[in-house]
Every structure is written in C-alpha cells, then in structure tokens.
Amino acid sequence: MIDELLAADVLVFGIPMYNFSVPAVFKAYIDQIARVGRTFTSSYEGLVKGKKAFVVTARGGGGYGPGEPRETVNFEDPYVKSVLGFIGITDVTFLHINNTARGEEVQASLNQVRTQIKEAASVS
C-alpha cells in the first residue's frame, strides 16, 4: 500500500462520515501507511511530499462546516487533515456531499461538488 501511495501524484479518498468521524476501514488504511522510515521520520517529519489530495466525503446531514451548528462534532475533517499532514501531504482539498439522507437536498450538494471538481480539474 505504501508503494502505491508514494507512486501517486494525486490522491483521491472517498470517505463517508460515520458517527462524526471516519469509518474503521479508513483508519485501518492509515494504520497501514503511517510507517516510520517510509512515510515519516523518527523525528516525526512527513516524507510524502509534493502530493495533492482530494477528500470526498458523504454525510447524511449537513451543517458540519466552519461556523455551522454541528462544526464541533466534525471529527472527520480535522483527523484526515492532521494525519495526511503528519505524513507530509499538506495540499488537501475537501469536497463534501451533504444531506445524503435527505432526498432532494442532496442534489444541491452534488451539484456544488461537481462544480468544485470541474474547477479543480481546470487548475491542475
């Protein structure tokens, strides 16, 4: 897994929000790639440099962003940003698909994310 990570120029992670955080399978992936001497040094310097990461999240509700009502229970974004930063990936863009459990409301969120993806693709 580490070799695949190191070989990639761009990383795309699809992560649903489970109980305000990441699913166990994503945590297990992080546990496999966070290795001293491979992705960080013994003095805790990240070794995975020069990579761009896109993190696409799916959430049943909304309001988890800065200044929103459920910001304080969003443990997903800070965790992902911190752990990727720890191994040296600091160029991270989050794309949030919100309200997946709310029928028609999800469409607006999907449209917003599609626009963000198109904008990101035109910059790259």
Named regions from a protein language model:
Residues I2-V73, P78:
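Helix-loop-strand module that forms the ligand-binding subsite of alpha/beta enzymes
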Residues P66-S124:
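Glycine-rich phosphate/pyrophosphate-binding loop and the adjoining helix
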